[in-house]
Amino acid sequence: MTDNKPSLSYKDAGVDIDAGNELVERIKSVSKKTHRPEVRGGLGGFGALCSLPTKYKEPLLVSGTDGVGTKLRLAMDLEQHDGIGIDLVAMCVNDLIVQGAEPLFFLDYYATGKLDVDTAAKVVTGIGKGCELSGCALIGGETAEMPGMYHGNDYDVAGFCVGVVEAADVIDGSRVKAGNVLIALGSSGPHSNGYSLVRKILEVSGCEASEVFDGKPLSEHLLEPTRIYVKSVLHLLESVQVNAITHITGGGFWENIPRVLPQGTKAVIDESSWQWPSIFNWLQENGNVTTHEMYRTFNCGVGLMIALEADKADEAIAILKSQGENVWQIGHIEDSSDNNQVEIK
């Protein structure tokens, strides 16, 4: 090292190790609140250890990973980060419950150009809340400060979740047949899908996110966290056999419903069985979006859809309502002679 050159540090290059350590200390209590008895050790190790619950005779592990998409851009623009962590967990655990799996543990990845500890702590606190709502443990994660890769304080998040299901109880759609009833569980809003279109509609409408619509600012409608259905559905599965569950995410009705239907069957959806939450009407009107495109992009008020035997529908609806869900019969299954597996009428 020569005397006429400055001594450079990692911080000079844009990576603040002290800020990262501060974040870790601030989120330890968040992780602790999500603890499950199967978890061995705490945060900070090179790997996280978790045993399988002893109640399972032939356990199968179910894994999923997801992000929040461009809902992040809206949250960053509005500087409202509290719900993003819940969204991240919800997008993963709701995919697991589709196969009947109980979420066990969750890991997150937070990447940014310049680490803002307060913002990151809000996001991770939301992740912890999502884990509490779904009964899974936050056992680890990665915070990556990468100057030059992201603009300013912009960030991205990704989540990874592992759950477990009894091998004999896997829900895979194979039992679905004509005559099954479809019940819907209401969404809390657009959840975490379609936000590139949401942002475009905001742009062309000329509306500000602070404008009040249906009793609260548009921003609150649009940043409402994704609803987590895990505990309600696990409670249902204790009493009622379910033939299929679908999570209405990217691709809407047209793409997600066929993912759980056997060939030769179709879902017939009764459009008169529910009213879209008002934010979807606002989006359709201000973006001049066709109804077909709405069902292709958004959940339109339906977060999950469940197929089951017709004589179990009333019991299932009662159980889910007792868990605080907005639930109703939305349609049924019919035989189909073509490749069209969704009919909305």
From Swiss-Prot:
Pfam family name, one: AIRS_C
Instruction: Return the EC number.
Output: 6.3.3.1
Q: Which GO terms describe its biological process?
A: 'de novo' IMP biosynthetic process; adenine biosynthetic process
| A GO term, aspect molecular function | ATP binding
**Family matches, as InterPro entries:** PurM-like_C_dom, PurM-like_C_sf, PurM-like_N, PurM-like_N_sf, PurM_cligase
Q: Does the keyword Methyltransferase apply?
A: no
Reactions the enzyme catalyzes: 2-formamido-N(1)-(5-O-phospho-beta-D-ribosyl)acetamidine + ATP = 5-amino-1-(5-phospho-beta-D-ribosyl)imidazole + ADP + phosphate + H(+)
Q: What is this protein called?
A: Phosphoribosylformylglycinamidine cyclo-ligase
